Amino acid sequence: MNDAPSTVGMIIFMTALGLLPFIIVTMTAFLKISVVMFIIRNAIGLQQTPPTLVLYSIALILTVFVSLPLMEDISNRLSARPLDVSSLDKLQASANVVKEPVKAHLMRYAKPGEREFFLSATARIWPPATRANVKDDDFIILLPAFVSSELTRAFEIGFLLFLPFLVIDIIVSNILMAMGMMMVSPTLISLPLKLFLFVAVDGWSRLMHGLILSYG
């Protein structure tokens, strides 16, 4: 019987470990940062460079940097009240300690309009008994609102990043057509120009700085 708490704790730890990728992708800056990174790679025209693993690693590093205050807050709360898995009630009490900073984080970056939509959507797709006590600060509302808000911001940034590279593609294509060089692939000419532009404006630094400061 003495091994029961440790067994329960191990099960909870393994479950939390399995959910960690889901938590990182849906509750942190990783979602927006990774999407922007892939958009800029496609905008330049480099299909495999930087490699996908490198882009995910950059996104993860920047996510840790941005989320450090949140992680520190959670760590301090758990230090003040260590996680207790000896019973479900104590486990729930410990989880409530962590819940507040995470909820505040999601509230900060989830657009009010998205929260209102998902709250109103419950009236259309949930039965009355299920939606009776739902509020706009519940996780079931905050999480999809946060994901939708982050994706919207990511594509807004991606659109602005795409424009100058699109202009280069159009100019190069028109010049080649005017010169009668239709057999020459525009990518052969535009890719070095886009790389030069990105390097000349210190693209990676500016991109990462902007993504980090967007959470200020």
Show where each model-derived region lies.
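Hydrophobic alpha-helical segments and their helix-loop boundaries in membrane
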Residues: 1-216
